[in-house]
């Protein structure tokens, strides 16, 4: 899909297409729509990320809370968004053994208890062995640093998803 197509979308179509660029946060797409026209993918990204950056900390934490646990119960039940399903499966998280799933569940619970939001990682840049290592490492980070890191991961995920959408055949959206 080209940027002209993006710029010609009405609000409903734009939210339908871009509403999950940030996991389960169609409000961001609805807000970004009013910033049209976009010159290119980077400009579109800039507006998505500026919206996130402009939020108060509680809003940023809310965005993080919209993300599922990696290899969590939603993956096991098959209730992830299509994007998260592909990303987590691609990182090998669907094929974890019972011990690996248990270890990740324990780390996810510790992380949530410590920071108040789920561990967010751009799974496309990771794999089943790196995820628990990174989760354990980030558990030791100061809260303010971890908020910045987690939001950086949200932006990596968003960047990949936006690029996927702009490369996609509009007839398949």
UniProtKB/Swiss-Prot annotation:
One of the GO biological process terms: purine nucleobase metabolic process
Family: Belongs to the OHCU decarboxylase family.
Protein name: Putative 2-oxo-4-hydroxy-4-carboxy-5-ureidoimidazoline decarboxylase
Assigned EC number: 4.1.1.97
SUPFAM superfamilies membership: UraD-Like
InterPro entries, per the entry: OHCU_decarboxylase (IPR018020), OHCU_decarboxylase-1 (IPR017580), OHCU_decarboxylase_sf (IPR036778)
Record's keyword terms, sorted: Decarboxylase, Lyase, Peroxisome, Purine metabolism
Pfam families tied to this protein: OHCU_decarbox
């Amino acid at each position: 899909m080209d940027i002209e197509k993006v710029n010609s979308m009405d609000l409903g179509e734009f939210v339908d297409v871009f509403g999950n660029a940030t996991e389960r946060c169609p409000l961001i797409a609805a807000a970004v729509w009013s910033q049209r026209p976009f010159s290119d993918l980077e400009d579109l990204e800039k507006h998505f990320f500026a919206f996130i950056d402009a939020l108060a900390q509680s809003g940023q934490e809310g965005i993080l809370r919209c993300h599922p646990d990696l290899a969590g119960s939603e993956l096991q039940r098959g209730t992830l968004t299509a994007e998260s399903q592909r990303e987590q499966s691609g990182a090998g998280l669907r094929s974890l053994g019972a011990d690996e799933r248990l270890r990740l569940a324990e780390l996810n619970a510790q992380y949530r208890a410590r920071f108040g939001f789920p561990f967010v990682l751009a799974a496309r840049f990771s794999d089943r062995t790196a995820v628990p290592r990174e989760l354990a490492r980030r558990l030791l980070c100061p809260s303010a640093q971890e908020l910045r890191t987690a939001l950086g991961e949200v932006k990596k995920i968003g960047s990949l998803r936006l690029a996927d959408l702009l490369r996609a055949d509009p007839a398949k959206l």
